């Protein structure tokens, strides 16, 4: 009940934009703090068969019946490929400082490799997009890989299950740095590697959709106890080699920065029992530390080494040194918090899988009460204090890095029976961002080096396995006509960010 009363109070408070602008606004943050909003190629661009683009694993996966909740796909998405110039006007209308987007690997290298040819039309599209972003006074924050492996590499050698992916990714990154790095000063190698590896190779709920038959009969045959870790290992090596290339070949002249974007929930002990407190650590290690520990310390968390054993790949001494320190900043995506309850004994018949290797039952409910107000997406519950806790944890454990909150947002149902005029009144989203910005500000005051905050997402988009069933955007998109409408939250941000 406490969180409900708080949410109602905050909604009432932030509904008065003028009052918020006078009390809490962009000037409540450091002068160089960056506010932005985000997107991703497959979720936005559409035009999958235009401009020389080759297919990605998401083109394949989304067209398999039953993989996407509403049977949809990203063939058109929000048609950003054709509408980006007018769409970017919304970003400036909201007084944002930056625009985050990803480059589609298969739009640059349709066959995934340099030898397969560089697509000049793809280069031209992203050059134009970058120039349009900059011409509006916005900073481009560019992600090199956001889940969309070229299908050609999946067919050729199972992509991230093979060490061959390292060279091909570095070659692709090299093209991006060379063609766009004179204007792009903030690069992310990968977005949410944990989601990509756990979903794509553990549960099979993300492309390429692989898992063990004992996890699901609906997956492509895989190995949920091994493949997530193999894919993650090769991804980390690809990331580190790309960072080394950028630092050795481009950084001195282009004067940019490069990092990687992680994702994690925050976790709260289910009870005061010591076992549940230990479960919090294991939860963080398996979700966050899996990809953070190697780039900070040069190896996986000790808890993972202990529980996963020989299924967890080992770095050579040279690889450990390569991976360690391979970032200038950390992107951090946060959406929700869970309770962590220890599983004291692993059932003897339970077969290995990433999802159960941590010996933790993660839940948003305790005694039937949710940890916070539920979003439309079933796994998300609003718990803004968790963002502050995650930021403080990152500062303490991971050597006090520069951090950009690269994604933070909430969604509502895509309900076609609600008139658009009503659907635009997203007070819940305003409350969500207000709360999370307040806790971000508090973390900064406590010494966390948070450099920016990006909303997820810019406009209602294709949300992977959920399709178009939910709406995360600040801008409403009519799925029938693709016409754009500004939600109330977009006006709130315009006022909050007014200079």
Swiss-Prot record:
Documented EC number(s): 3.2.1.21
One GO BP: carbohydrate metabolic process
Similarity comment: Belongs to the glycosyl hydrolase 1 family.
Entry superkingdom: Eukaryota
Coiled coil: none
Binding sites annotated in the UniProt record for a beta-D-glucoside: 43, 146, 191-192, 335, 407, 456, 463-464, 472
InterPro entries attached to this UniProt entry: Glyco_hydro_1, Glyco_hydro_1_N_CS, Glycoside_hydrolase_SF
Signal peptide: 1-19
GO molecular function: beta-D-fucosidase activity; beta-galactosidase activity; beta-glucosidase activity
Keywords of the record: Disulfide bond, Glycoprotein, Glycosidase, Hydrolase, Signal
List of glycosylated residues: 111, 361, 408, 414-415
Gene of this entry: BGLU27
Disulfide bonds: 211-219
Originating species: Oryza sativa subsp. japonica (Rice)
Catalytic activity, reaction form: Hydrolysis of terminal, non-reducing beta-D-glucosyl residues with release of beta-D-glucose
Listed Pfam families: Glyco_hydro_1
Name of the protein in its database record: Beta-glucosidase 27
Record-annotated active site: 192, 407
